[in-house]
Regions:
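A short, N-terminal "cap"/entry segment at the start of jelly-roll beta-barrel domains
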Residues: 1-45
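Double-stranded beta-helix
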Residues: 104-142
Length: 142
């Protein structure tokens, strides 16, 4: 598989497919969620997605670090010990891997999400070391 040096997409035109929220996580309403992945890193640890959801309140578990950027609508989020926050168009947030949060969508929300799976600490150390070595041999900018 050869990956392009640059991948670009119009987030408004990404075709989403049904991606149901776990029924046990729904607090109220009948939220309908859809999503699509549009790219992945070479090593597979980072992926980019577009996700949307209709009205409802639910809990959400983050299996990976997830950076979200709201591109339409809004959502109110909260987590244990963290004040409630409404994210609207243009807002971004980071949800840490292994955490739970509560999401309340008043009408509709659409987000762009970047998911990064955490590496085991020993692998992480090796990656950081390899990057340091690679910097020494990096070609000079033209």
């Amino acid at each position: 598989l050869t990956l392009s040096a640059i991948e670009a997409v119009s987030l408004d035109h990404v075709l989403l497919e049904d991606d149901p929220i776990n029924r046990d996580w729904i607090i109220f309403g009948t939220p309908v969620a859809r999503s699509a992945q549009w790219s992945a890193s070479k090593d597979g640890t980072t992926t980019t997605h577009v996700w949307d959801c209709t009205k409802g309140r639910f809990r959400w578990y983050f299996h990976a670090d997830e950076i979200v950027h709201i591109i339409e609508g809004s959502v109110t989020v909260q987590a244990d010990g963290i004040a409630e926050r409404t994210l609207s168009v243009g807002d971004a947030a980071l949800f840490r891997a292994g955490s739970w949060s509560e999401w309340e969508v008043e009408e509709y929300v659409r987000k762009h999400a970047i998911l990064s799976s955490p590496l085991h600490p020993t692998v992480s150390f090796g990656v950081r070391a390899a990057r340091r070595v690679a910097r020494v041999f990096r070609p000079k900018a033209k």
